[in-house]
């Protein structure tokens, strides 16, 4: 297996984490892979000429474009965001090569949006392959609850709701703050909301916390390197995003066996459903009710159920098994027509 990174500087750390027989960094800047990408196509052709390959996996639209034009191989194109086929040119390209192309969305939500954009495609060529984590590797990085709280400067005994993500409209931390405000009167007085991350709304969100009268109960940590190491500092993890394509941070929270509260939209809801609490996006009253429910249930958290769902649906092993069982992939391995 050969893995090629179109963009980014060479990195030994990335190469080691890639788990590939060979890792090649082409070193393009993002601005250099706009347009026709003829040089990148030529380089991929040179790489392909050195060996015998069964198929190509391409993450996102630009690598898919390069893979399709550089080879005659079947291409498995993985999509991590919505509206990847909003442009006519992208729809035209994949329609041109439909006979040797499988599209995978990282959630049913992304998959369904692609199917709506490409209504003439058979459903068997637009499927779901969830994101995944190495559960044991992630868990090995966690600090203990006490150590994590000490590092973040948090009190040892407070009940803490955690949120991790960019401070951006898409993450809707404004609803998170309002929901916490609504719940706080029924929570212990020393309860905290901890928001880990930075972004363009940092100043506005801090002002909102002041306006709501909860600034003393909200901690903005800013960016924290290797933030997931400190997830055990939290008692509950809350994600309030608007139509999240997936929500990798939820998997990391599940690895810490944290109770989950999530907006009922996008891929995040698919991750949480069955082991967490969902609320309508933007509904701070419903979010407050979820927070209170999690507090009242704090002695009865079913950590085993959370970890079981993580292992069975979103672990490396589960997603790898799902990939090799995809009908498109099975036909490739059996040298059957796709």
What are these regions (language model features)?
Residues 274-284, 293-299:
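Conserved acidic donor-binding segment of nucleotide-sugar-dependent glycosyltransferases
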Residues 159, 163-184, 200-207, 285:
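A conserved mid-protein helix/loop that constitutes part of the nucleotide-sugar donor-binding site
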């Amino acid at each position: 297996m050969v893995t090629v990174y179109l963009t980014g500087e060479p990195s030994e750390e990335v190469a080691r984490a890639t788990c590939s027989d060979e890792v090649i960094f082409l070193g393009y800047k993002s601005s250099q892979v706009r347009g026709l990408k003829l040089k990148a196509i030529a380089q991929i052709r040179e790489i392909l000429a050195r060996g015998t390959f069964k198929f190509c996996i391409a993450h996102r639209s630009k690598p898919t474009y390069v893979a399709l034009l550089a080879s005659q191989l079947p291409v498995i194109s993985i999509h991590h965001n919505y509206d990847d086929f909003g442009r006519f040119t992208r729809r035209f390209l994949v329609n041109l090569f439909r006979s040797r192309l499988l599209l995978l969305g990282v959630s049913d939500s992304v998959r369904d949006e692609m199917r709506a954009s490409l209504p003439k495609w058979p459903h068997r060529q637009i499927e779901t392959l969830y994101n995944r984590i190495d559960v044991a590797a992630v868990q090995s990085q966690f600090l203990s609850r006490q150590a994590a709280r000490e590092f973040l400067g948090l009190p040892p005994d407070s009940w803490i709701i955690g949120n991790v993500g960019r401070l951006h409209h898409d993450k809707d931390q404004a609803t998170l703050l309002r929901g916490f405000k609504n719940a706080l009167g029924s929570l212990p007085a020393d309860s905290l909301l901890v928001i880990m991350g930075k972004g363009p709304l940092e100043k506005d969100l801090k002002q909102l916390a002041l306006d709501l009268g909860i600034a003393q109960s909200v901690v903005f940590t800013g960016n924290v390197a290797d933030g997931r190491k400190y997830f055990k500092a939290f008692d509950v993890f809350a994600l309030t995003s608007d139509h999240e394509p997936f929500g990798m941070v939820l998997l990391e929270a599940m690895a810490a066996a944290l109770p989950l509260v999530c907006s009922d939209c996008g891929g995040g809801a698919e991750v949480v459903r069955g082991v967490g609490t969902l609320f309508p996006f933007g509904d701070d009253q419903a979010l407050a009710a979820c927070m209170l429910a999690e507090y009242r249930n704090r002695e009865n958290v079913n950590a085993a159920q959370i970890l079981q769902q993580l292992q069975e649906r979103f672990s490396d092993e589960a997603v790898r098994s799902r990939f090799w069982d995809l009908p498109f992939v099975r036909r490739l391995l059996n040298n059957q027509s796709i």
